[in-house]
């Protein structure tokens, strides 16, 4: 991979990075607003999305979820407790390893998540081309 030096940074790069950051921040702000409108705290929306979208083969344990969320174990347990009380998720013991507890999404949680993801996809259709253009500007090979 070629090394990029300070001399390789152009005005286009600054503009592209600024635009990229603006669009990403705007997307997350709108996502948080949509979550609140749906009756969720934004962190609960992120949790449901993470839970439903875990990589194949990754077990939905508190430890794995905490790591993926960037939270401490006890903070994740508190989040799971609150969401379980609302009927969005539930805990289930592993059949193979009885000491493992998995977190699962309920039909109620899945229904809310599905609506939110559908609206987020529509927003990405609008913002996507701008994000792609900015990424292309930032990642194109320097020709000198």
Model-found features: residue ranges?
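Charged, amphipathic alpha-helical coiled-coil/dimerization segments
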Residues: 81-139
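Short, charged, intrinsically disordered terminal tails
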Residues: 140-144
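N-terminal helix-turn-helix DNA-binding core of bacterial DNA-binding proteins
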Residues: 29-72
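Pre-recognition alpha-helix immediately N-terminal to the DNA-recognition helix
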Residues: 19, 26, 46-50, 111
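Short, hydrophobic-biased segments on the C-terminal half of alpha helices
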Residues: 62, 80-81
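N-terminal leader segment of winged-helix/HTH proteins
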Residues: 1-38, 86-88
């Amino acid at each position: 991979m070629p090394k990029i030096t300070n001399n390789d940074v152009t005005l286009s790069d600054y503009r592209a990075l600024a635009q990229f950051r603006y669009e990403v921040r705007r997307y997350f702000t709108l996502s948080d607003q949509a979550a609140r409108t749906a009756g969720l705290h934004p962190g609960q929306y992120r949790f449901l999305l993470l839970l439903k979208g875990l990589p194949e083969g990754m077990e939905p344990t508190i430890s794995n979820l905490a790591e993926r969320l960037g939270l401490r174990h006890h903070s994740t347990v508190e989040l799971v407790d609150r969401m379980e009380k609302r009927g969005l998720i539930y805990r289930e013991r592993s059949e193979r390893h009885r000491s493992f507890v998995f977190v699962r999404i309920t039909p109620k949680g899945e229904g809310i998540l599905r609506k939110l993801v559908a609206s987020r996809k529509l927003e990405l259709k609008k913002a996507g081309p701008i994000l792609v253009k900015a990424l292309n500007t930032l990642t194109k090979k320097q020709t000198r």
